[in-house]
Amino acid sequence: MEHQATLNDIQKAVWDGRLPLQITLSPSESRSYDKTDPYLISYPRISYLPSLLPRLHAFFSSSLIEPTSKPHDGWFSFEGVPLKWHLPVGLLYDLYAGADPASKGSGPASDDETAEFPLPWRLVVQFSDWPDEELVRLDADGMVMHDAFINSVKEADFMRNGTAKGIMTLSKEDSSGLWKSVQDVDLPSFQRISNILLPPPNQPFRNVPIRFFLPLPPDSGAPSLKVVQSPLPPTLPPSSMAASQAAISRTPQPQTLGTALHALLPNLFPSRRTPVLAKPVLHGAVLPMSAPVEEVVRSSAYGDGWVYIVVRMMG
């Protein structure tokens, strides 16, 4: 019971996490070019940027060169890079602005990981020139965003249970309520519905829904992000040395973040216990390699049920 309480405390801390944003209207769309006042907000890390579009459109309406634009025409960018609207804002920050200063230029390294990109995180919003090659268009009713979220929930449900029957059999009210609870950052309502989908604590997942994001160098000629995903059981398979040792005690050994990273990315994580070349980052914090992956998912998943870990190079 005490262990479960600890996981619940971690989940509450995750949902309480916020990120200060400073959002400016693109100078190309502003009547006053770059003189428009920015929009400042402390925004939940688990939330999605499109939820801000109605209030941003209203805030910038008097400055828009094209006042006939609609809120759902809006899209966000950071340093000229369009931001994927289906990813939570906390993940986007960890990907694009949370890199070590040593990897962001020729200046001396600093212990302050936000030295290169001090908070608030500065974003640009535009309501025209949608980047069709990089982003799927949104709609006025918000159904595109809703459907993308639910599809991601289905994928996570399938990973955990080997079937998406749980989310498919949710009532329409609960399905809509799950998305609304994330939009409203309403953890009690979210827990009530998500607990229907999660196996009970004494029943292990079939696989854990985790994706690893690998930022690539700008001159790689490839997309700026690479995603690594593979079925990860919550306990070590019999072929591993640790599992062989566990066979003696007949106690399954938990799959830790270190064993998972070593199996999937051995060149970046040659050690199962200690980060040597890279480190795993979730919700802006470096995770311990000893963390059992199922506990990480139960306590620290985003609203869609996935854990999105950013692999950040060291040094």
UniProtKB/Swiss-Prot annotation:
Subcellular location: Preautophagosomal structure membrane
The species this protein was found in: Aspergillus terreus (strain NIH 2624 / FGSC A1156)
Function per UniProt: Involved in cytoplasm to vacuole transport (Cvt) and autophagic vesicle formation. Autophagy is essential for maintenance of amino acid levels and protein synthesis under nitrogen starvation. Required for selective autophagic degradation of the nucleus (nucleophagy). Also required for mitophagy, which eliminates defective or superfluous mitochondria in order to fulfill cellular energy requirements and prevent excess ROS production.
Membrane topology: Peripheral membrane protein
Gene from which the chain derives: atg5
InterPro entries documented for this protein: Atg5 (IPR007239), ATG5_HBR (IPR048940), Atg5_HR (IPR042526), ATG5_UblA (IPR048939), Atg5_UblA_dom_sf (IPR042527), ATG5_UblB (IPR048318)
Family: Belongs to the ATG5 family.
Keyword Transport: yes
Chief site of localization: membrane
UniProt keyword Oxidoreductase present: no
Modifications the protein undergoes after translation, according to the UniProt entry: Conjugated to atg12; which is essential for autophagy.
Molecular function via GO: Atg8-family ligase activity
Cross-link (Glycyl lysine isopeptide (Lys-Gly) (interchain with G-Cter in atg12)): 154
Source species, domain of life: Eukaryota
Keywords recorded for this protein, A-Z: Autophagy, Isopeptide bond, Membrane, Protein transport, Transport, Ubl conjugation
A Pfam family of this chain: ATG5_HBR
Name of the protein: Autophagy protein 5
